[in-house]
């Protein structure tokens, strides 16, 4: 720090004004003020002391006071500009920490801030969570530091955890990588595991899935030895607890300690419904069970300040713009929750008007909405809020009164001060701002009210709203008016009966911000922080009452005060005892003067009563009884070798609440053991399954051609058994009524809210699948957020829909955030306007005029991007003239501000982590592509010399889920001869290599390209074999890649067809150009919403095609199946059949494409097939659908009879099995699952992308069903590097269909200057080998193809290069070894996660599809060409195969496939890998290479999107 700056700061901090000298027995408190230039953030007392710290955020400094704020000094041990965050140790009154950012060195004090020492955390503090430090409750030296390692600045950051056991006296040690927050189990003094060694060492970490950045894939891991290797094999000691009794749960998003409870919150894909799990020892866990009419959703529940014997939670039950809730209280183990009070008042931040009275058990105050029904009907209606209090822990509530009038108090939702709202440790003293009357009035009309009997009775204090504090155990009440200019404080020395005023010194006037004192309210000193008149003027006012009275209270000045009394003033019992405090009498003329000594209650046990008992484990209260909801826990040895009707002494259903101290009376007790039958100790044995398929048809009246249908899906961990589908019959001109089913089509009804409504389009939320929006052309929208249980509505801004654009855009994390793009008309002109809402349509703000489209590009998966980022394409100037160019405009603050990023663009699309923009190149009259990761900076793409893009007019963006953009570049084409190349980018989307040429496409630039769902890097394409012979019809062949497009091979043909007959041609095992299996691709698909594979059926894939030298006519095609991800295929049916996957792949269903009355299904992966008739006469099956995850055992057939009537048939296969499959990890024969590993056809070791992954699949001979979602990746082993882990580098290409990469004809390898310029932070360039590592490969050692050549220094990095590559010095050798290991180990893993998905890749094949109405008419431009033209010369097709993304989205309608609704260009989340690229990773810290940390943060996966031209339409 500069000396001058230090002196100025010191002078400023010590420039203070005394108002009154400290004289004995003064009539008023003493004041001392300090003037500041910046607000004193984060002001904190060291507990039980007058020592205070605050931080100056503007200067990055810490200041300290030893006299309760009277004087201040600057902490000189911390250099100016370093202090970023001040953290107090919650369990040690002498320790505090100052964190720096950026930086890996931080500061600590162990002597209340007198001295500070720096410590090495070896990582930066994480920017992704607030709880940087996690403290051990009983050992202050044990601290966990949640940090992050970053690559390329803060572009790709991964969270890591460090720890110390000596209070950072020595450097922090590495705990675990790939974390999302770690904490000690013993994070609360009340919590215990029951074992001293576990209390000391046990750590819980939320761990990011190795393959995914999705919060829905995070898991909870526990370790008792700091996640260290427990043996020489390097296996980390950690285990995953069974959160749901018998099985682990994925999707863990938060862990919190509440008193003696440990709470874990988990989320699932497709929904914002949450699951809560509770433990009081980390050993036994329970799912928190709420009444069935209320679910726990993200951002809709608040864990309140709970007790030592129960958890209290408030759950929002209404619309977020005007929220209300219901408060629940659990039993003592946190399992079952019962309703306390309805219509609690909440705000949109999740704050609830609830507060317990400090130090008194069983008393808390709440505000509720008195006109709840009115507010529910009118979301803009004004709440009429009333205050109530309970004295029996929420069993009953009663009004609050002052002067015989009802009193209402402003509470937590209107916080105006630090700390608690009403009470403090001062026994029985409570204050609040409010008013008397029928309900709570506005804040400005409030006055101060006081109670000295814990809220039973109240008196009025000073008029107007005030900040207030308690001192000297309640002897002093201090208040300051909440106003713009205040020059006095008010105080009372007799519990608020009388008030005096004291002027601030030197005519000082401030706007009060904070009034505070010590945590225990035992001090006579207070601190007031206020804002002065001038700009950047703040004041700290120290207020001292210690000189006002000489007398110290004697015993005669004290009284006994009972915390809870009944109407007659008699002490009442709670938790088996009464509670009494010794406190100063109201009118005593003395101070207690027991600083830093907390009041301690006296208790007296009561005789036990019914309220001292609760329902026992596996029992639930039903009125006045406890009923069994599970199995009875039998004592050890009971029922061993006994019959089901034999008895034992077991629980009565009741137990004494743990911690209850009541005295038992003589005689029978409520929890006495009773006779129980042994059959009650186990679940009833299920009866034998029927083995039958249930068929339930439903007729839709009228003449129709097809159906529009949408699945409203649920989360994987949802307890809801319903399967909801919305459908309506349609024809070319109109649509019928909307129907809804909750049982997958067995019964249907018309929702009253939608009956006879003219619905233009149905839009399902692509991220939160329980939501659907029913859009009318006027802009009125009806919607449901709970699978059709309830319906709401809003009016969109503007003048209705624009039929040429999708009206709604959704945010991936916030279900209430929406963008509406509609028509806005002013005078004689109309244009598109984009408006934004944060409360699901209640309020709108215009963000852009003359807009083409907008997308939310911010997401929790993109840690390198602003979460509030929106990108829009907007006309460069307003007006309706043709050919006005568009600009790419982005905003990182929800369009409070915005900036033009690219000019003259045609369109943009998002794909995985990439944003790709197509802009017009006016010189070449063609398109030019740009790519961005952060949405702010865009780099031009560079294509290899063997790819001609000089006159490019269209690009199709294919699946890009593996840290690389896959771009289809069409070749100059003749009519019906569209072919092109697939180019694959590097990890930042800028440098491309050719993956494969001659790929088939159609005139709309849709491509025969298919990704296999769930598995990484398995791709199918169709190429045109005779592309040089332009006069011949196309001869197409199918190729498959198991290396993400690095190498290709033919599909191996089966030997015999479905009838056992030999095929006419034979080939090698892997197929060749003369004989192979060929599959009809995306360009021939009538329904672009169908996929070959399913997210839930790993390794399984169907296809329709033929065996031969080329692909034949589809009329001659048969149906084929692979169960090993394309390594081998078998013919399962003659002819072309449709397929669907059920029960996560254990049920496969087929139906003929011709008229039929039967379906065929298999439960053994196609070894045997069974037929089932679903109707009496052959009908046209328009479609067969099920849930997108493939996890249901119900299917729907959508059919049309010859008389043009339509109907749907539910096929229920639950009768095939009624026992849930079980996984037994250590007993393969007992387990119903086996570990299946995909393999590479060219590798004998089953390695793919540098590792061998094992997936759980149900054994085909087991008669059970998959009750729960199967663990996606069971385990993974890392492999050595081989050729299959590398692909051709920039300007190199495969030599034929071979394995060698050669320089493209006429091309030059990338020069050292070009490579170093593209990688400015790298020091070393290797002469090109022709190869580069596949970004998702995790291989280590072995044969390294990309950097075995000669190395050279990058310009400007010569010294660094010499240090790395210089002579044989020990340190240099050490660096070389480290860099080599870092380059080999820090490589990307990308396993695409699609368990709740409907599609992945440019070809979106889900298990459902739909048709639409007018905009779905075959003559409609939406169907004819899913494009948007932008100019006559150079245009860019805008909408395209990019549907609603990959991962957890299902394929909905063809409309969605084109992106008319629900997220063109905006994907869902993808998976997290360990880095990529051929260069060595440059880590933030010196030992990061040893940690196994990832290089990539959130990655988004999406489907293909077409960027091209079309001259048929204009904008």
From Swiss-Prot:
Record field: compositional bias (Basic and acidic residues): 673-682
Keyword Ion transport assigned: no
Residues annotated as transmembrane: 1371-1391, 1427-1447
GO annotation terms (biological process): Golgi to endosome transport; Golgi to vacuole transport; protein targeting to vacuole
Residue numbers spanned by region Disordered: 673-698, 1494-1515
Biased composition (Acidic residues): 1498-1515
Glycosylation site list: 333, 692, 699, 988, 1173, 1227, 1347
Pfam families: Sortilin-Vps10, Sortilin_C
Cleaved signal peptide residues: 1-24
Membrane topology: Multi-pass membrane protein
Gene3D superfamilies: 2.10.70.80, 3.30.60.270, YVTN repeat-like/Quinoprotein amine dehydrogenase (2.130.10.10)
Bias (Polar residues): 683-698
Side of membrane Lumenal, spans: 25-1370, 1448-1515
Keyword annotations from UniProtKB, A to Z: Glycoprotein, Golgi apparatus, Membrane, Protein transport, Receptor, Repeat, Signal, Transmembrane, Transmembrane helix, Transport
Superkingdom of this protein's organism: Eukaryota
Membrane topology, Cytoplasmic segments: 1392-1426
PANTHER family hit by this protein: SORTILIN RELATED, SORTILIN-RELATED RECEPTOR
Similarity comment: family membership: Belongs to the VPS10-related sortilin family.
Function: Functions as a sorting receptor in the Golgi compartment required for the intracellular sorting and delivery of soluble vacuolar proteins, like carboxypeptidase Y (CPY) and proteinase A. Executes multiple rounds of sorting by cycling between the late Golgi and a prevacuolar endosome-like compartment.
Name by which UniProt lists this protein: Vacuolar protein sorting/targeting protein 10
Gene that this sequence comes from: VPS10
């Amino acid at each position: 720090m500069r000396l001058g700056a230090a002196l100025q700061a010191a002078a400023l901090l010590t420039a203070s004004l005394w108002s009154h000298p400290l004289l004995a027995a003064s009539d008023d408190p003493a004041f001392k003020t300090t003037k500041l230039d910046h607000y004193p953030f984060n002001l904190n007392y060291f507990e039980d002391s007058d020592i205070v710290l605050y931080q100056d955020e503007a200067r990055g400094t810490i200041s300290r006071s030893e006299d309760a704020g009277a004087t201040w000094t600057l902490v000189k041990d911390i250099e100016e500009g370093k202090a970023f965050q001040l953290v107090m140790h919650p369990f040690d009154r002498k320790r505090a920490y100052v964190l720096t950012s950026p930086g890996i060195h931080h500061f600590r004090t162990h002597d209340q801030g007198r001295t500070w020492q720096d410590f090495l955390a070896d990582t930066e503090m994480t920017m992704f969570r607030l709880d940087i430090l996690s403290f051990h409750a009983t050992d202050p030296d044990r601290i966990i530091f949640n940090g992050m390692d970053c690559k390329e600045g803060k572009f790709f950051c991964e969270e890591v955890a460090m720890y110390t056991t000596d209070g950072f006296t020595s450097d922090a040690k590495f705990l675990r990588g790939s974390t999302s927050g770690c904490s000690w189990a013993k994070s609360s003094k009340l919590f215990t595991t029951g074992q001293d060694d576990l209390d000391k060492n046990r750590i819980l970490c939320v761990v990011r899935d190795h393959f995914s950045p999705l919060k829905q894939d995070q898991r909870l891991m526990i370790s008792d030895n700091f996640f260290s290797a427990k043996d020489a094999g390097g296996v980390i000691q950690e285990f995953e607890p069974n959160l749901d009794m018998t099985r682990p749960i994925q999707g863990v998003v938060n862990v919190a300690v509440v008193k003696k409870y440990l709470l874990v919150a988990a989320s699932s894909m497709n929904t914002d419904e949450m699951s809560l799990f509770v433990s009081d020892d980390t050993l036994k866990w329970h799912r928190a069970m709420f009444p069935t009419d209320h679910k726990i959703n993200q951002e809709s529940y608040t864990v309140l300040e709970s007790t030592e014997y129960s958890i209290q939670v408030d759950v929002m039950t209404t619309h977020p713009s005007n929220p209300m809730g219901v408060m629940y209280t659990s039993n003592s183990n946190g399992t079952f929750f019962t309703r306390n009070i309805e219509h609690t008042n909440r705000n949109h931040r999740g704050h609830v008007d609830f507060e317990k009275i400090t130090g008194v058990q069983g008393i808390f105050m709440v505000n509720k909405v008195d006109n709840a029904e009115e507010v529910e009907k009118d979301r803009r209606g004004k709440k009429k809020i009333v205050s109530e209090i309970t004295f029996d822990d929420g069993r009953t509530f009663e009004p609050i009164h002052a002067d015989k009038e009802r009193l209402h108090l402003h509470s937590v939702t209107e916080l105006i001060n630090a700390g608690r709202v009403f009470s403090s440790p001062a026994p029985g003293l409570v204050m609040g701002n409010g008013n008397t009357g029928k309900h709570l009035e506005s804040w400005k009309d409030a006055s101060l009210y006081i109670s000295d009997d814990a809220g039973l009775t109240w008196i009025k204090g000073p008029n107007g709203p005030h900040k207030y504090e308690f001192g000297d155990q309640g002897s002093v009440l201090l208040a300051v008016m909440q106003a713009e200019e205040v020059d006095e404080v008010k105080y009372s020395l007799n519990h608020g009966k009388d008030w005096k005023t004291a002027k601030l010194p030197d005519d000082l006037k401030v706007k009060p911000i904070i009034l505070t004192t010590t945590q225990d309210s035992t001090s006579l000193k207070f601190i007031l922080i206020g804002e002065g008149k001038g700009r950047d003027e703040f004041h700290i006012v120290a207020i001292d009452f210690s000189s006002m009275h000489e007398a110290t209270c004697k015993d005669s000045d004290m009284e006994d005060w009972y915390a809870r009394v009944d109407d007659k003033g008699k002490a009442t019992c709670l938790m088996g005892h009464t509670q009494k405090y010794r406190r100063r009498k109201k009118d005593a003329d003395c101070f207690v003067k027991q600083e830093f000594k907390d009041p301690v209650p006296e208790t007296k046990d009561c005789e036990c009563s019914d309220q001292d008992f609760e329902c026992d484990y596996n029992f639930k209260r039903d009125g006045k009884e406890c009923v069994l909801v599970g199995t009875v826990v039998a004592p050890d040895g009971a029922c061993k070798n006994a019959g089901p009707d034999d008895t034992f002494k077991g629980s009565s259903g009741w137990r004494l609440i743990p911690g209850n101290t009541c005295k038992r009376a003589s005689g029978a007790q409520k929890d006495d053991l009773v006779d129980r039958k042994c059959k009650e100790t186990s679940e009833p044995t299920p009866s034998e399954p029927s083995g039958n398929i249930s068929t339930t048809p439903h007729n839709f009246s009228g003449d129709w051609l097809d159906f529009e249908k949408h699945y409203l899906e649920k989360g994987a961990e949802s307890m809801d058994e319903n399967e909801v589908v919305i459908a309506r019959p349609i024809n070319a001109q109109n649509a019928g009524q909307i129907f809804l089913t909750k049982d997958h089509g067995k019964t249907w009804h018309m929702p009253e809210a939608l009956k006879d409504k003219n619905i233009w389009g149905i839009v399902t939320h692509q991220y939160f699948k329980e939501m659907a929006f029913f859009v009318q052309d006027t802009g009125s929208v009806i919607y449901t957020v709970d699978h059709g249980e309830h319906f709401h509505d809003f009016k969109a801004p503007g003048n209705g829909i624009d039929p040429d654009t999708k009206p709604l855009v959704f945010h991936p994390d916030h279900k209430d955030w929406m963008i509406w793009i509609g028509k806005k008309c002013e005078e004689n002109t109309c244009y598109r306007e984009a408006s934004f809402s944060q409360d699901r349509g209640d309020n709108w703000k215009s963000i852009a005029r003359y807009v083409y489209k907008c997308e939310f590009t911010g997401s929790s998966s993109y840690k390198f991007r602003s979460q509030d980022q929106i990108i829009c394409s907007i006309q460069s100037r307003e007006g309706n003239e043709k050919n006005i160019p568009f600009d790419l405009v982005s905003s990182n603050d929800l369009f409070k501000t915005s900036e033009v990023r690219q000019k003259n663009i045609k369109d943009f699309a998002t794909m995985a982590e990439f944003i790709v923009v197509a802009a017009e190149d006016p010189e070449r009259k063609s398109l030019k592509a740009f790519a961005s990761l952060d949405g702010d900076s865009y780099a031009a793409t560079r294509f290899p010399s063997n790819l001609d893009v000089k006159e490019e007019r269209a690009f199709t963006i294919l699946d890009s889920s593996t840290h690389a953009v896959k771009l289809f570049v069409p070749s100059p084409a003749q009519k019906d001869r569209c072919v092109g190349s697939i180019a694959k980018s590097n990890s930042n989307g800028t440098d491309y290599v050719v993956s494969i040429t001659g790929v088939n496409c159609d005139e709309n630039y849709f491509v025969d390209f298919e990704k296999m769902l769930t598995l990484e890097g398995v791709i199918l394409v169709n190429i045109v074999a005779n592309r040089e012979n332009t006069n011949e019809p196309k001869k197409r062949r199918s190729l498959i890649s198991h290396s993400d497009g690095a190498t290709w091979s033919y599909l191996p043909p089966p030997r015999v067809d479905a009838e056992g007959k030999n095929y006419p041609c034979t080939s090698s095992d892997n197929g060749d150009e003369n004989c192979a299996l060929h599959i009809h691709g995306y360009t021939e698909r009538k329904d672009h919403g169908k996929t070959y594979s399913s997210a839930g059926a790993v390794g399984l894939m169907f296809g329709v095609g033929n065996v031969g030298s080329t692909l034949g006519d589809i009329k001659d095609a048969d149906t084929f199946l692979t169960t090993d991800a394309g390594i081998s295929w078998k013919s399962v049916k003659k002819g072309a059949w449709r397929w669907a996957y059920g029960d996560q792949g254990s049920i496969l269903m087929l139906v003929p494409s011709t008229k039929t009355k039967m379906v065929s299904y298999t439960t053994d992966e196609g070894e045997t097939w069974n037929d089932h008739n679903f109707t009496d006469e052959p009908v046209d099956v328009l479609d067969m659908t099920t849930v997108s995850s493939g996890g249901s055992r119900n299917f729907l057939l959508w059919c049309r009879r010859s008389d043009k009537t339509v109907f749907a048939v539910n096929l229920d296969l639950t009768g095939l099995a009624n026992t849930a499959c079980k996984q037994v990890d250590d007993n393969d024969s007992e387990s119903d699952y086996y570990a299946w590993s995909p393999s590479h056809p060219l590798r004998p070791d089953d390695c793919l992308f540098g590792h061998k992954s094992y997936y759980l699949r149900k054994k085909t001979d087991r008669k059970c069903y998959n009750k729960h979602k199967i663990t996606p990746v069971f385990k993974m082993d890392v492999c050595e590097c081989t050729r299959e882990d590398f692909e051709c580098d920039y300007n190199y290409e495969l030599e034929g269909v071979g394995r060698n990469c050669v320089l493209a004809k006429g091309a030059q390898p990338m020069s050292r200057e070009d490579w170093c310029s593209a990688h400015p932070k790298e020091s070393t360039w290797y002469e090109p080998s022709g190869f580069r590592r596949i970004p998702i490969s995790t291989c280590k050692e072995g044969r390294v193809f990309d950097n075995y050549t000669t190395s050279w220094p990058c310009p400007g990095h010569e010294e660094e290069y010499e240090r790395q590559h210089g002579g044989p010095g020990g340190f240099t050798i050490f660096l070389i070894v480290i860099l080599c290991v870092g380059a080999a180990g820090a490589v990307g893993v990308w396993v695409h996660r699609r368990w709740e998905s409907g599609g992945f890749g440019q070809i979106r094949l889900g298990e459902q599809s739909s048709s639409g109405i007018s905009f779905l008419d075959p003559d409609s431009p939406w169907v004819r060409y899913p494009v948007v033209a932008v100019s006559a010369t150079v245009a860019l097709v805008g909408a395209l195969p990019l549907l609603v993304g990959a991962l957890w989205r299902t394929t909905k309608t063809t409309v969605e496939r084109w992106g008319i609704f629900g997220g063109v260009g905006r994907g869902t989340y993808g998976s997290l890998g360990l880095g990529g690229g051929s260069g060595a990773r440059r880590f933030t810290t010196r030992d990061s290479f040893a940690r196994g940390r990832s290089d990539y943060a959130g990655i988004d996966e999406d489907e293909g999107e077409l960027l091209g031209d079309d001259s048929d339409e204009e904008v």
